[in-house]
Structures are given as structure tokens and as C-alpha cells.
Amino acid sequence: MSSVLPTPVLPTPGRNINRGHFPDDFIFGAGTSSYQIEGAAREGGRGPSIWDTFTHTHPELIQDGSNGDTAINSYNLYKEDIKIVKLMGLDAYRFSISWPRILPGGSINAGINQEGIKYYNNLIDELLANDIVPYVTLFHWDVPQALQDQYDGFLSDKIVDDFRDFAELCFWEFGDRVKNWITINEPESYSNFFGVAYDTPPKAHALKASRLLVPTTVARPSKPVRVFASTADPGTTTADQVYKVGHNLLLAHAAAIQVYRDKFQNTQEGTFGMALVTQWMKPLNENNPADVEAASRAFDFKFGWFMQPLITGEYPKSMRQLLGPRLREFTPDQKKLLIGSYDYVGVNYYTATYVSSAQPPHDKKKAVFHTDGNFYTTDSKDGVLIGPLAGPAWLNIVPEGIYHVLHDIKENYEDPVIYITENGVYEVNDTAKTLSEARVDTTRLHYLQDHLSKVLEARHQGVRVQGYLVWSLMDNWELRAGYTSRFGLIHVDYYNNFARYPKDSAIWFRNAFHKRLRIHVNKARPQEDDGAFDTPRKRLRKY
């Protein structure tokens, strides 16, 4: 990882940043994912996913005991949500396709759900009718429960063929209008945090539960849900299973790209990437070579794990050296499919951490993912946080981190085209706040301003970043956190029919980045203002 960065060639505008500081073809948008917003878990022919099963069998492992059955009801309110995107003047909207909504049984042979096809056709057509470019994620972690039951999901290489078939169906049905595809969102997160690495679930890959049997009830198994897959080899560690899941995710990505390039590229002319989670790995002691090397290893285990195979067909050298035969090798044919299987790199950035060197564990049988890299992480140094915490846990606000991450990718991964596919911050869902108070999100406003300024600074220095998608468009159901964390530009009233209201950050984003503002630097507002985002707080209205 680079420690010496070039001097900026242009001044940056700081918190006065707006669309005019970026080139006309730079994309601004916001994102969501299917399970987190759609709801309608038992509507429209959708089958259950592993998240349906997990949240219903183990509600105690979701922070507020909730689930995504209703989420924020975007399945029924998608036209309203697209109207919001249009009012904000965004170029793009990122959403994911629910695999079990398209293929309730997980595979083509189990049947195609035409109601699901119709829903996404309607969504895409509505976006295009409103001059909004769709960015579509194929896999945002909602494995069909049917495939989990059949062969343990991504712990089995059987899923590669089923994912390829699912992807091909999506290209056939939607590719005439969708030109920007993301195969997999955060494979590191899925393999690790939502996988089998820790003693704290959800361990979604390993779930082997009774299916959701009928549309209105949820089957609760009489015995505990298995937390480790029954097909695991005797004697393997949970970390070994994490790498197995990651390996199959990479093969699934490559298979999807292959089928697109073989059958659709010439006529549809779409582009592809994976959305990879990043974190600025800052050496705890920058004068200590061991800590500098540890920070580099940490970035390998976070980002390089999934990026390096797309360049060389091999995992990062540090991972191969430390893991040895525990890390599977790619065959020559698999390497051919992996190398170059991207047009751009999607970067998800939220936070940063200090990294220091650590000794490897003496007992290899007790190896877990975070001991494999021989590094420690901490959010503080000498009692001082690396950045202020957004809430009670995990997200330290470190805007300079996105600048360093972008440079590291440029310098160490062949200078790719980059889109920021997620960047955002949460606030705690404080139910004591009034609606007016809940819309005041100064922390998010400053977070976005400061991070965008650092993105612009990186562009000035030659990083080929071409778009920025906020996470997220709206408050939604946040996986393990349930409804306790709010990431949205748009406030969603969970208690009154999921009514949508703009927060201060949404109003600022519209006024600074509306697509009408492409021409003049420092122009403050769109030329035509319908006032929808400036409703006085005493007269808040639903969209």
C-alpha cells in the first residue's frame, strides 16, 4: 500500500462541493437492496431466502427482533420511490434483483416466477421513463432457501451453475434496458460476517432449516437450526469454510460474466463490476515496518482477496503464503474466466481502522478469519479514536480514508475505472424524536460533503473514479440491526404506512447535485425548482 501520495493539483471546495466541480459525465445516484426495502415476502410468487428463514427462526439475533417481511414496502411503493429519485435529480438508482423472487426454487428447473419478472420490468421501465439510469446488482446476499436446503448454498460449488442460470435469465429479460451490472455485492462481507467465520450469527450460509411452508405462516423447526453446514469436511475450521464461500462467489461472478460476453455483449453492450467493501487500513505506528506490512496484509484480506484474482487469476501473495493449502487454487480454465472479468471496480467505503502486527495463533485448529492475517485492528490510538463514532458501534467517520483507499486501488490494482457504489453513515433510530427532529441529519450531511470532497481530490490526482452512489436512498431494514439504524437520505416513518420524507441531507444533495447543475461551478440550486424538498417543517407532506 502506498504511503506517499501526490500533492493535489487543484484546490477542493470542501463543504461547498457541488455537481459543477465534477465532469458532466460523472454519475450521482443512490442505492438500495431487495431484501432491505421490498417487503412483500409472501407476495407475487416470491420464494423464501436464507434471510427469511434466519430472521424467523432466530429473531433474538436481530437487534430489535424484526425481519424484512415488510421492510419498507417498496415492492408496492416503487413508483413513489422513483418519484423521489427524480425529484432529487439523481442520474442513477442502484437496486438488486431478489433471486428467490425470480426463481422461487432457486434453479431454472424449479420454475420461473413471471410475476417477479413483471415486477422488475415495471421497475426498470419506470426508471427509464423518468430519465434515471438503472444500476442492477444480481446478488445482494439473498440466497434462495431452496438452494441452502439442497446443498448448503455458497458452501457448495453446485451454486455456480445455478447463479449463472439466474444471471442469464436476468440478462435475457432485462439486459435490453439495463447496461450497468454489479454481479455480487461485498463478497468479503458475505463470506465473513454473514457466513461461518464467527461465533456470533447470522451464519446464513450454514442454515439448514425447514422451509417456509405456506404463504401466511413460517415453519419453526422443533430442533435448533444448524449453524455450521453439514457438508463441511471433518476437521476443517470455520475460517476454511469462509474461504470456500469466497472461492465459489468468485467462480459465480466469472460464470455470469462469461455467459454475458458469450451471448449478450455484442447486442446489449453492458458493463460489469463487483461491489467490493473497503476500509482504510492505517498502520498503528507508521514508523514501524511491521505495522505497515500488517496494514497491507489487512487490505489484502479485505479487498485484494476478491480483486487480485480478477487481475492475475490468483489470490494475493500474502494470503497464499499464510494460508497455504487451506486456500483453494483456481484451475487454468477458471483463471482464464476470472482474469479481466470486470469493466470497473465498485468500491463500498464507510470507515477506517488502525492496524498493527500480530503473532499467528499457536493452535492452527482454532484459526479464525481475523487471526489468519496476523494483524490486529483497533479504532483508537493512545486513547484517541481514529474518527468520531457515528453511533454506538463500528462506523468511525474518517473522510480521508476514502482518498487513501482510492489511491491504493489505482496504484496497486492496475488503475481501474472506479465507481463508489456505497458510501454513507447511519444514525440510531431514536423513537423519541419528532418527525421534524428526525429529519435533521447534520452528521450525514457533513459526512457526505467531506467524503465527496476527498473523492474529488483523488480525481484531481488521476484516480479514475466516475460515479458516486450514496448508501442509501431511504431508511431501510438493516440486516442484523433491523430497524434500529437509519442510513437513508429519505426518512421513512416505520409507524405510519412507511411514509417518506426528505432529510436535510436529501435537500442538500438535491440542491448541490441535481442533474440540471452540470454546467456552472458554485451554482446553488436547480434552474427549475418545484419546491418539493423545501416544504416547511410545520407542513411536512408525504411524497
Curated annotation (Swiss-Prot):
| Binding sites annotated in the UniProt record for a beta-D-glucoside | 36, 140, 185-186, 350, 422, 471, 487
Chief localisation class: cytoplasm
Name the Pfam families on file. Glyco_hydro_1
Identify the metabolic or biological route this protein is part of.
Answer: Alkaloid biosynthesis
Identify a single GO molecular function assigned to this protein: beta-glucosidase activity
Q: Where is the active site?
A: 186 (proton donor), 422 (nucleophile)
Q: Site Controls the gate shape and acceptance of substrates: give positions.
A: 394
Compartment(s)? Cytoplasm, Cytosol
Gene Ontology annotations of biological process type:
glucan catabolic process; isoquinoline alkaloid biosynthetic process
Cellular component GO terms held in the UniProt record: cytosol
Which keywords does this Swiss-Prot/TrEMBL entry list?
Alkaloid metabolism, Cytoplasm, Glycosidase, Hydrolase
Query: Keyword Cytoplasm on this protein?
Result: yes
Which function does this protein serve? Answer: Beta-glucosidase catalyzing deglucosylation on N-deacetylisoipecoside and N-deacetylipecoside.
Give yes or no: UniProt keyword Cell cycle: no
Q: At the top level of its lineage, which domain of life is listed?
A: Eukaryota
Quote the protein name from its UniProt record: Ipecac alkaloid beta-glucosidase 2
Tell me the protein family, please.
Answer: Belongs to the glycosyl hydrolase 1 family.
What does the record give as the reaction this protein catalyses? Answer: deacetylipecoside + H2O = deacetylipecoside aglycone + D-glucose; deacetylisoipecoside + H2O = deacetylisoipecoside aglycone + D-glucose
Enzyme Commission code(s) on record: 3.2.1.-
